[in-house]
Amino acid sequence: RTLLANEIFIFSSEYGKKGVEDTNAVRLKNQLTKTEDVKTLRNYNIWTGKGNIAEADLDSDETRELADDFLNETGLEWGRSQHGGRSHRGFTVLDLTKKNTRHAYTFRDNPDDTTIIELRAHNHYTMCGGKYDDGDTAIFNKADKPSEITWAQLHKQIGMLGVAATMLRKARISDPHNEFYKYMAGALKQHKLTYEDAEKIFDAVIAHHGHCKRSERMAQLKSVYNAEVTEQTGLPTIVKQWNWSELEKDDFKKLLYVITGRHSLPAATNDFVKRIAYMMKQKKF
């Protein structure tokens, strides 16, 4: 009842099967308009974009673990029962437009499903009740009013969460830890993150990693951010020392660009900036 009162568009689909093949006409026909029409052997889905609803889809263990550190609290949480109904978070986006559709972010460190987080709005849907084709069920953890946010704010939070999740995954398998955190600090500065954003990422990762002293790691971060540019060591060192693939490097950079807004620049802009920086270092500009 609360969901319908908040103008969240819910439609039913075949039980035990994702409604991805349903046409928009079918979804409109199957819209749920009153709670009395809810049936037990049906799946139920939220049509994102409708009513300015967007969702954060937490596809990896690390993004689910860290979500509360980065995403605004909201009254709308749902997902698989095995994830406690918290793997999807819904928000009302105040400035949502038709061009705000879907952004999916991966970390390709394995041959399986590598998507770690998604931001979805127009032209997409998300299952919120019923049974998946693998037998798991979808449940609500909260079914109240979604909190309000702007698209840019939510997208940045998605980027921050994705970077922190990737960093946490790698921190757990990268020794020595002190060097990993030092070079990661360099990577964040290298990609123009503010100290405040870098500090928030470090804080969350350190708290969940649990194998190092916060004071030591934060001192490293501050030292790197206070250092001259010529003294920096960042992502290239991480890639080399811990054998990251080019795919892993590209995925991580994509998330870093979301935080600073560089993801919205034309595709050639980042290469142009790199060329200018190189020329400046060579004193040719």
Predicted regions and their residues:
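Conserved phosphate/metal-binding and DNA-contacting active-site motifs used
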Residues: 1-165
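Structural motif
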Residues: 40-42, 169-180, 192-197
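Intrinsic-disorder/low-complexity linker and hinge segments
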Residues: 156-172, 262-270
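Alpha-helix N-cap/N′ positions at the starts of helices
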Residues: 163, 179-183
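N-terminal nucleic-acid engagement/recognition segments and initiation subdomains in replication
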Residues: 185-204, 239-285
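Short, mixed-charge aromatic SLiMs
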Residues: 203-218
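Long, compositionally biased
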Residues: 215-249
